[in-house]
Structure formats: structure tokens, C-alpha cells
Amino acid sequence: NNRSFYHNYVWTIKQPPKIIFGQNSVNQYVFPDKCLVITSKGAKSRGWLDYSGLNNKIIFDDVEPNPSIETTTKIISKFHDSDFTHIIGIGGGSSMDVAKYCAFKMNKLKIMIPTTFGSGSEVTRISVLKVDGNKKSFHDDKIFADIAIVDSYFIKNSSDEIIKNSVIDACAQATEAYDSKLANPYTKLLCENAFNILENAILNQTYEKLPLGSLMCGLGFGNSSTTLGHALSYVYSNEGYSHGHALAFTTQVAHKFNQS
């Protein structure tokens, strides 16, 4: 019953020590001098580096969608002698997952900046990478960002396809985590509110609200778990389908199967 759920249950919350949220928060942030920026090919052309003031940093801009562990090996090998203090991940979940994993292995401080709003990777202790062609999740408290900066500016240049892909991911994470056996009152509160914010933003095309929904979702599922929908989706992701595209099908199937 609810009483025993709230009173006889011990749970722990973990998240990055510092989260900065708000319009133009990235543009106003003063980044450390010695940084490695990890991102994808389009970062420069989309103006992300100009806006963030990161053009003069060391830049690796070759992160692929659904990235492989070989990409992290290449980065670690290429930059292991460099004297930077921070690794900055700027982009979608792929860029941030690579950046977090590299910083974890290289023992560098981590600053994560999402430019899509769905993965929640900026606030989780998870890095998802392909190993031998199959997606694998790495979990460790040392994978957490030291600073997450969430700025709705980046929604402006997002295509409808990227927005849909990201929002489906966030909604799937929220509904799966709400029903997770690892859920607790705090994560349920976050996931329910995240879903409502995301749904409202899509129905009313108020996309500037998506970053808040995504952030709350990341904190919610990051302290519980995704479930069957995400597990099933990796079968499609391994065949090259986008993460959101796969989840649009598998999460519904999972909820029907679980009657949740």
C-alpha cells in the first residue's frame, strides 16, 4: 500500500553537483581555458561553437549517431598527451555519451551541454556505446557530468525530425521509469511532471518548454531505470534505426505487455 511504499522504503538520489538551466545560459558561461570539445560534424555549421564561445578550444567533431566504443578509444589515444583539464560534450545523447566516457577514462572534469532535448544524458551516470555492433550501457558514478548546462537556445535550429526523435525518447524514458520497480516517490514525481510538460509542449508547439521536460525526465529515469521498451529498442537501433523511431514502436508494445 501507499503508506508502506512511502515509509518503509530506502532510496538514494544521485545527480550532477551543478546544473545550470535557462535561456542563453551557455552563451553567458565562462568556460575553462584548457578544454577538449567533443561533438558531431554539424556543430560548426549550426553555429553551436560560435554561440558557446568554444571555437578556440581543441575540438573533436567526429562523433557518429549510435556511437561505438572505438570512437572513444580513438579520442583517448589521440589526446592522451594533451594538458586540458575539462572535456566538454556538446550535442545530442551520442556526443555527450562519448564525452562522458572519455572523461571518465581520462580522469578529466566534465561539462555537458545538450543541443537536443530527450536523452537526459547531461544528468545521468550512464554512457551508451556500441560494443561489437551491439549497444551496451556503462553505469558508474564517475560518468556523471560535473556541470550540466541546459539552454533552450539550441531548440531554434532543430529540425522537426530531431525534435520528434528526442521527445519520443524522453516520453518513453518518463513512462518506463514511472513504472520501473526501481522507481520511488521522487522519481515518479519527476517522470509524471516531465511527461506532462513534454506532452503540452508538443500539442501546443511550445518547443521552448522541451528542455525542462527533458531535464526532469533525465533526473527521474536516471535515479530509477528505463525498462522493457528501451531494451527492445536496441534491436532496431543495432540495425540503424534512430533511437526515437525505434522507441515509438517498442515502448507502446512494452506497456501493453506489462499492462502499465
Regions found by a protein language model. Give the residues of each.
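Gly/Pro-rich interdomain helix-loop hinge
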Residues: 238-260
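ATP/NTP phosphate-donor binding region
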Residues: 1-86
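Alpha-helix C-terminal capping segments
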Residues: 100-109, 221-224, 238-240, 256
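Histidine-centered catalytic micro-motifs
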Residues: 226-244
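Glycine/threonine-rich beta-strand-loop-alpha-helix active-site module
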Residues: 69-153
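Carboxylate- and glycine-rich phosphate/diphosphate-binding segment that chelates Mg2+/Mn2+
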Residues: 126-224
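Active-site nucleophile and cofactor-binding loops and adjacent substrate-binding regions
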Residues: 64, 90-92, 240-244
